[in-house]
């Protein structure tokens, strides 16, 4: 699409140059013909030449003269071109007589970029009449991105127009009028809408559906009160006026009643109308101009934000950082999330025996970063940030070579000349450009720091394993203690249930409060149950004397004792 637009623009410029050249040729031919016509004596040869020149002049007059005024001086330069010969002028005029091309390109939005096209002796165009020399102005209504190509035949018919968007209003011959300036009230108040100056009058013609009236600003109240609209000989409030027009169900007189095609809400937004509050007690709201009360204006309700409402600004999230190792053959990427988790996407090796040249580029973000290049690194590793600035313990038992379980030795490459540490999205500095040399003391310090870092990592892993083992042991102990507790509780419940069963009354089954003093094996809840059960229990108890229950003496008559005695 861009290629076609640029081609159209180039074609338009070429055609505009051709049109200008043809116009210049026509003017030169006309001037030559007039100078030759002034000579009184002509020979036969000169007569033939004059006929040819007059014919060329007639052909030239049929050519449409085009004058193009461009906003930029670099588009066209016609002042330094030399005039062609009469023969070339006649040939160009004859070739140009059929079709005239008018090209307008690079139309800007300013008022100075106006292209004026003059059409001479053209017939009527469809919808327009061009008589004599008519100026056609194409102004700001054209699109600023596309070129305009207009092909006009000499018979006056428009053949083709491409890349031209029709203006909102029809184009009329003659100079364009400048845009009308804003009214003084609009410039000062800064209204949102373009109003007629009559909007500031005290009386405004309003309409609701097909009923018209006159709104008096001085009598405007809250809408429900204050009869400010006069229709005929009657006065109505805005709500009554919209109800009379059949819009009572809308309950929004600010949008039902219109002035100049716009609802009254637009006038209220621009501050031209100021309705009163519902609690206003002024003379207009009370429909009594003899009263005088305070005026309370209507204040639009603004929605308040809740306290627990989330803020509109997005919360900045910490993006995961990538540590990419770029060796000669493969690449390994470590992703460090904001929570501290580390994930890898390949194999990693640390060649502790060989000394290689590496370039380390450490970048915190694409916008800012520190570059360390040209360092001699013997061991490649990642230093944990938590150990910076703290003394490291010395472990004499560790050897120079160590193995890490998560990375098998067989799957790891061993010779990688370059190691690059970077973060998302990409490096800003190429890793192959050395910028600063590091002294051997710094390199040895880095080696010691790396060795201590690996020792610290191994110690931390061992401590984590020990902690996990201890946690597992404590878990088993807690589980056993819980099971023992449940067994003890179950046994205590069974014992309590057994005791309750033993202490129940043998007669009624209720909870026993006393027992037999003779055998201490039978329990009773009351003396009534004891007397009732005595007939059966006396054979088991084996006592014929009186029975005492809880220090209560039971006296039995002698006759009964004699009968019961065995």
From Swiss-Prot:
Keywords: Cytoplasm, Developmental protein, DNA-binding, Metal-binding, Neurogenesis, Nucleus, Phosphoprotein, Transcription, Transcription regulation, Zinc, Zinc-finger. Ubiquitously expressed during embryogenesis, with higher expression in regions of the central nervous system, dorsal root ganglia, submandibular gland, epidermis and breast. In 12-week-old NOD mice, expression of isoform 2 is sevenfold higher in lymph node stromal elements than in T-cells and tenfold higher than in B-cells. Transcription factor that binds to sequence with multiple copies of 5'-TTC[CG]G-3' present in its own promoter and that of the HNRPA2B1 gene. Down-regulates transcription of these genes. Binds to the retinoic acid response element (RARE) 5'-AGGGTTCACCGAAAGTTCA-3'. Activates the proenkephalin gene independently of promoter binding, probably through protein-protein interaction. Regulates epithelial cell proliferation and side-branching in the mammary gland. Required for neural tube closure and skeletal patterning. Controls the expression of peripheral tissue antigens in pancreatic lymph nodes. One of its GO terms (molecular function) is DNA-binding transcription repressor activity, RNA polymerase II-specific. Gene3D superfamilies: 6.10.140.2220, SAND domain-like. Residues 194-274 form the SAND domain. This is Deformed epidermal autoregulatory factor 1 homolog. The keyword Acetylation does not apply. It comes from Mus musculus. A motif (Nuclear localization signal) lies at residues 300-306.
